[in-house]
Amino acid sequence: MKSRHKKLALIGGALAIIGIIAALVLNALNSNIALYISPTDVAEGKAPQGKAFRIGGLVKEGSLQRQADGVTIAFVVTDTAKDMTVHYKGILPDLFKEGKGVVAQGKMAADGTFTASEVLAKHDENYMPPEAAKAVGDAQAKSAGAEKPKASY
């Protein structure tokens, strides 16, 4: 082989290796992405089937139910427009309370409930997870817009 052909082969091999590494990294990142979906979006059928996503809002007052085993919990997440039942098996964060902000990551179950693999609670009195705050604000805006008749000129 000539020197020129060796250089071209080396450059081609390096580009192929870089391409394979880039494809593997993008595949790993794509599989770890969890979209945020509000309870209203889930009710409208916008939740991905068979893929993990995050759902957020407020824990509905009086909805927390603990099973006899002590680690299985069911609660309702609301964005003030729609509600979604969440099932979680594990220890809840210390700051988890009814009426407070929460974001849960998991998948939709066959029965239409959300099975969470992770539950995140708010940090302090003034904090609500950004996704939950946006969902609550959007839901309130939708319900306010639906209640008010639109002006015609």
Curated annotation (Swiss-Prot):
Superkingdom assignment: Bacteria
Membrane topology: Single-pass type II membrane protein
Sites where the protein binds heme: 123, 127
Sequence intervals crossing the membrane: 8-28
Compartment(s) where it occurs, according to its Swiss-Prot or TrEMBL record: Cell inner membrane
GO function term, MF aspect, one: heme binding
Gene Ontology CC, one term: plasma membrane
GO biological process terms, semicolon-separated: cytochrome complex assembly
Keywords on record: Cell inner membrane, Cell membrane, Cytochrome c-type biogenesis, Heme, Iron, Membrane, Metal-binding, Signal-anchor, Transmembrane, Transmembrane helix
Xref: Pfam families: CcmE (PF03100)
Keyword Heme found: yes
Keyword flag Transmembrane helix: yes
Major subcellular site: membrane
Gene3D superfamilies per UniProt: Nucleic acid-binding proteins
Ranges of the Cytoplasmic topological domain: 1-7
Residue numbers on the Periplasmic membrane side: 29-153
Region (Disordered): 130-153
Role of this protein: Heme chaperone required for the biogenesis of c-type cytochromes. Transiently binds heme delivered by CcmC and transfers the heme to apo-cytochromes in a process facilitated by CcmF and CcmH.
HAMAP family listed in its UniProt record: CcmE
Protein family membership: Belongs to the CcmE/CycJ family.
Name of this chain's protein: Cytochrome c-type biogenesis protein CcmE
Source species of the chain: Dechloromonas aromatica (strain RCB)
Source lineage: Bacteria, Pseudomonadati, Pseudomonadota, Betaproteobacteria, Rhodocyclales
